[in-house]
């Protein structure tokens, strides 16, 4: 399966925007391995400021800790690429921007940086909705770096859309 195109990301970002706008919700993002691709997909739609508050590209552990309040001990215990950190990033984004929802992604885009436990392509996508526990999914992609980033962004957008639909 091919990674999603920029047009596919934009379409899903627009669908998420429509769902958020219908509920009068706002969203924030915390992106590590995708480097802002989720925010880019969302803001390709005119009027995205109605529902997108902003995002943090938290590529380093220090950025995760200082900008989004992820505890240093959590990163030390589980690693930056983990379910626990993805959950904390989503919660931190929603808290920082005072939004109803935060989404996050952390992973290993490649081509280097993988390990036996966490191979290249391994990503965690998270969503946190105010008043509810964060939900995180693990995804494994087998594309080149850009393809892994696009696939992770698509997975995060879809998880957020599913979360909005589940709140109906």
Features from the language model and the residues they span:
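Short alpha-helical segments enriched in small residues
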Residues: 1-168
């Amino acid at each position: 399966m091919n990674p999603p195109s920029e047009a596919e990301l934009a379409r899903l970002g627009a669908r998420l925007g429509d769902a958020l706008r219908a509920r009068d919700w706002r969203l924030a993002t915390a992106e590590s391995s995708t480097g802002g691709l989720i925010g880019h997909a969302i803001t390709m739609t005119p009027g995205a400021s109605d529902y997108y508050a902003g995002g943090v590209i938290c590529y380093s552990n220090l950025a995760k800790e200082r900008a989004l309040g992820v505890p240093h001990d959590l990163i030390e215990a589980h690693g930056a690429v983990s379910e626990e950190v993805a959950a904390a990033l989503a919660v931190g984004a929603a808290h920082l921007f005072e939004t109803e929802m935060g989404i996050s992604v952390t992973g290993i885009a490649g081509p280097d940086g993988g390990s036996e436990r966490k191979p290249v392509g391994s990503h965690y996508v998270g969503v946190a909705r105010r008043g509810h526990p964060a939900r995180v999914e693990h995804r494994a992609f087998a594309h080149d770096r850009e393809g892994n980033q696009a696939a992770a962004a698509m997975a995060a957008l879809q998880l957020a859309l599913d979360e909005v639909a589940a709140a109906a």
